[in-house]
Amino acid sequence: MKVYSSIKKRCEHCRIIRRKGKRFVICRVNPSHKQRQG
C-alpha cells in the first residue's frame, strides 16, 4: 500500500472509502492500486 497526500482512482474498479478518518483506495482486480491518504 502506498501513502499519498492526493489519492486518485487508477482504474474503473478502484473505490475510495473512509476508515477511521483516513481515505483509502481499494481495488479487487488490481491489488497494486491500493493507496492511503494521511
Swiss-Prot record:
One of its GO terms (biological process) is translation. GO terms for cellular component: cytoplasm; ribonucleoprotein complex; ribosome. InterPro entries: Ribosomal_bL36, Ribosomal_bL36_sp. It holds the Pfam family Ribosomal_L36. It comes from the Bacteria. GO terms for molecular function: structural constituent of ribosome. Keywords: Ribonucleoprotein, Ribosomal protein. PANTHER family: 50S RIBOSOMAL PROTEIN L36, CHLOROPLASTIC, LARGE RIBOSOMAL SUBUNIT PROTEIN BL36C. Belongs to the bacterial ribosomal protein bL36 family. This is Large ribosomal subunit protein bL36. It comes from Chlorobium phaeobacteroides (strain BS1). The lineage of its organism: Bacteria, Pseudomonadati, Chlorobiota, Chlorobiia, Chlorobiales.
